[in-house]
Amino acid sequence: MVLGSAALFVLSLCVTELTLHAADTCPEVKVLDLEGSNKLTILQGCPGLPGALGPKGEAGAKGDRGESGLPGHPGKAGPTGPKGDRGEKGVRGEKGDTGPSQSCATGPRTCKELLTRGYFLTGWYTIYLPDCRPLTVLCDMDTDGGGWTVFQRRIDGTVDFFRDWTSYKQGFGSQLGEFWLGNDNIHALTTQGTNELRVDLADFDGNHDFAKYSSFQIQGEAEKYKLILGNFLGGGAGDSLTSQNNMLFSTKDQDNDQGSSNCAVRYHGAWWYSDCHTSNLNGLYLRGLHKSYANGVNWKSWKGYNYSYKVSEMKVRLI
C-alpha cells in the first residue's frame, strides 16, 4: 500500500515530535529510503531494564600452575622464641695431638728475662723450661740487681725438709713459706746457659749476709744430680759450698756420699754430701744455737756447726 502525501506528512510530524521528546535519553534515529523521495524515519527505542541474574555456572576445570613469581622482600624478624630444653650430652671425641704452645714460643725462660720485660716486683711468675714445660717460680727482683730465681727457701720451720729422694726430685713446700723447687726443675733451669749462684742467710738477731759463686749447675737424675760449682766470688757469709763441688745428691733413702755412713740420715738433711759437709741448708730448723752437732740449717764459715739460721735462700741468675 502506497501512503498518500498527506498521510506521510502527518506521520513525519509525529515522528519528529517523538524524536524531540526523547532526544535527551534516546538520541539515535535512523532514516531509511523506501522508494524515490518517500523516506521512512525509524526511531530506535531505549534499552530495556537489565534482566534478572541467571544462575551461577559450574566451575571450570583447574588450570595449569603458573610460573613462580619473583621472591618478595624479607620480612622483619619475629620475636625470640622461648629457650628450648637442653639436648643430650654428646659423645666425647678422641684426644687430639698437643699443638705448639704460643706461650712457650714467646714466654719468658728466666726471672732475669722477666726483669728485662719490665716485671720489677718480687713474686711468683710462670716461666718456660727448655722443653716448653711451664714452671711457677719465685723471682727475687730486689736483691743484688734482681732477676734471681729462688730454688730453696727456709724461713720459719713449717715445712719438713727431711724427705726422700722422690720428694727432692719433684719438689715440695708452699709458695707462702718454705720450699724446694725440685731437682728435675733445678737441673732444667741450670742447663740453659751459665747461671751464677747466690746464698742469702739471716740469723735470729737480724743480721744478714751472703755468699756468691760464679756458676752453679746440677746434672740430671742419671748422674744423681751431681753439683758443678764455679769459683767463690765473695760475701760475708764465707765459702761453705766449694767442698761439696762434684758431689752427688743424697737423701735419707739414697746414700750417694763418700762417707762410711749415710750423711743424710746422720745430719737429718738432703745435700751434696762428701764426708760429710761444711753446709747443710736442708737440715733441721733448730732456731739459732743448738747443742746437737751439724744437723741444723748450717753454714760453717759464718756461725759454725752449732747455729741454725732463721732464713736461708738459694737462688740462680742467668749470666
UniProtKB/Swiss-Prot annotation:
GO terms under cellular component: collagen trimer; collagen-containing extracellular matrix; extracellular space; plasma membrane; serine-type endopeptidase complex
Membrane-crossing residue ranges in chain numbering: none
Keyword tags: Calcium, Collagen, Complement activation lectin pathway, Disulfide bond, Glycoprotein, Immunity, Innate immunity, Lectin, Metal-binding, Repeat, Secreted, Signal
Metal-binding listed as a keyword: yes
Recorded superkingdom: Eukaryota
Pfam families, sorted: Collagen, Fibrinogen_C
GO-annotated molecular function: antigen binding; carbohydrate binding; carbohydrate derivative binding; G protein-coupled receptor binding; metal ion binding; pattern recognition receptor activity; sialic acid binding; signaling receptor binding
Disulphide bridges: 104-132, 111-139, 263-276
Residue numbers spanned by region Disordered: 53-106
Signal peptide: 1-22
GO BP annotations, alphabetical order: cell surface pattern recognition receptor signaling pathway; complement activation, lectin pathway; G protein-coupled receptor signaling pathway; host-mediated suppression of symbiont invasion; positive regulation of interleukin-8 production; positive regulation of opsonization; protein localization to cell surface; proteolysis
Fibrinogen C-terminal domain sequence ranges: 102-319
Major localisation: secreted
Residues bearing attached sugar chains per UniProt: 306
Binding site for Ca(2+): 255, 257, 261
Comp. bias (Basic and acidic residues): 83-97
Domain Collagen-like positions: 45-101
Gene3D superfamilies in UniProt: Gamma Fibrinogen, chain A, domain 1 (3.90.215.10)
Entry's localization field: Secreted
InterPro entries documented for this protein: Collagen, Fibrinogen-like_C, Fibrinogen_a/b/g_C_1, Fibrinogen_a/b/g_C_dom, Fibrinogen_C-term_domain, Fibrinogen_CS
Family indicated by similarity: Belongs to the ficolin lectin family.
Oligomeric and partner information: Homotrimer. Interacts with elastin. Interacts with MASP1 and MASP2.
Summary of the function given for this chain in its UniProt record: May function in innate immunity through activation of the lectin complement pathway. Calcium-dependent and GlcNAc-binding lectin.
UniProt remark on domains: The fibrinogen-like domain (FBG) contains calcium-binding sites that may be involved in carbohydrate binding.
Protein's name according to its UniProt entry: Ficolin-2
